[in-house]
C-alpha cells in the first residue's frame, strides 16, 4: 500500500437508542447514534410481530364479488 494516501482509521463508539454501546473502527471520526441494533431489533430478539392482512384481503375480495355480480 502507498503511504499517506489512506484515510485515518480510528475507533469510534456507536450508541443505540436502547442503551447498547458498540465500539467499532471507522474512517469517519464521529461517534454514531443508532436507532436500532442487534440487541433490540425484532428479527434478532425473536419478538417479531406478524401483521395479519388477511382481514383486509378478504374484505377486498368480498367487495369485488359484489361489484362483479351487480355488473353482470
UniProtKB/Swiss-Prot annotation:
Q: Which residues form the signal peptide?
A: none
Spell out the GO cellular component terms annotated for this protein, sorted alphabetically and separated by semicolons.
ribonucleoprotein complex; ribosome
Name what cofactor the protein needs.
Answer: Zn(2+)
Q: Which UniProt keywords apply?
A: Metal-binding, Ribonucleoprotein, Ribosomal protein, RNA-binding, rRNA-binding, Zinc
The superkingdom of the source organism is: Bacteria
Quaternary state and interactors: Part of the 50S ribosomal subunit.
Q: Which organism is it from?
A: Buchnera aphidicola subsp. Schizaphis graminum (strain Sg)
The name this protein goes by in its record? Large ribosomal subunit protein bL31
Q: What does this protein do?
A: Binds the 23S rRNA.
- Which note does the record give on the cofactor? Binds 1 zinc ion per subunit.
What family does the entry list? Belongs to the bacterial ribosomal protein bL31 family. Type A subfamily.
Name the gene behind this protein.
rpmE
Question: Which Cys residues form disulphide pairs?
Answer: none
Q: GO molecular-function annotation terms? A: metal ion binding; rRNA binding; structural constituent of ribosome
Q: Which residues bind Zn(2+)?
A: 16, 18, 37, 40
